[in-house]
Amino acid sequence: MSKSDLNLLVENIKFEHLSIFYDFILSVLNTLSISDFELSVILCDNVYIQKLNNKFRNKNEPTDVLSFNYNEVNEDLVDGINYKIQGDLIISFEYLKFSAQEFNVEIYEELQRVTIHGILHLMGYKHETNDFQKEGMLILQENILRKNKRVF
């Protein structure tokens, strides 16, 4: 029996588009053929994510997104990819303001991009570089974004 559980939380920031964001995440999961999931997404500020980044990665600095996968090693992998997600995504909305400026995109587009990125990592996808032209995971990420992009 498959589970579908998506929780959105907001820590130390204002975010008024939870319903649009919620629908976006469900659409991405559907595009990826994921119907069995327990996923929590926390939108936060730089202080919140920096504490977690320091605690779990020994990097005392903020970052855009952290993925925490709670899946046990299982036999449900298809070519190394897990279609059953159990984990948390922590996203610094404050950090995304800087990334969006750097990449010359709207902040909500960047939010959607890093959300997809985190979900792909929870599935087991990896990338060695940030080359959007050559890295399979990043090409997939951009294709999913094009198919599911929302206006906030």
Swiss-Prot record:
Give the domain of life: Bacteria
Q: Give EC number(s), comma-separated.
A: 3.1.-.-
User: What Gene3D superfamilies does this protein's entry cite?
Assistant: Metalloproteases ('zincins'), catalytic domain (3.40.390.30)
Give the cofactors, semicolon-separated.
Answer: Zn(2+)
Q: Which Pfam families match?
A: YbeY
This entry carries the following GO cellular component terms, namely: cytoplasm
GO biological process assignments: rRNA processing
Alphabetical UniProt keywords: Cytoplasm, Endonuclease, Hydrolase, Metal-binding, Nuclease, Ribosome biogenesis, rRNA processing, Zinc
- Supply the name of the protein: Endoribonuclease YbeY
Q: What are the leading ranks of the lineage?
A: Bacteria, Pseudomonadati, Spirochaetota, Spirochaetia, Spirochaetales
Q: Gene behind this chain?
A: ybeY
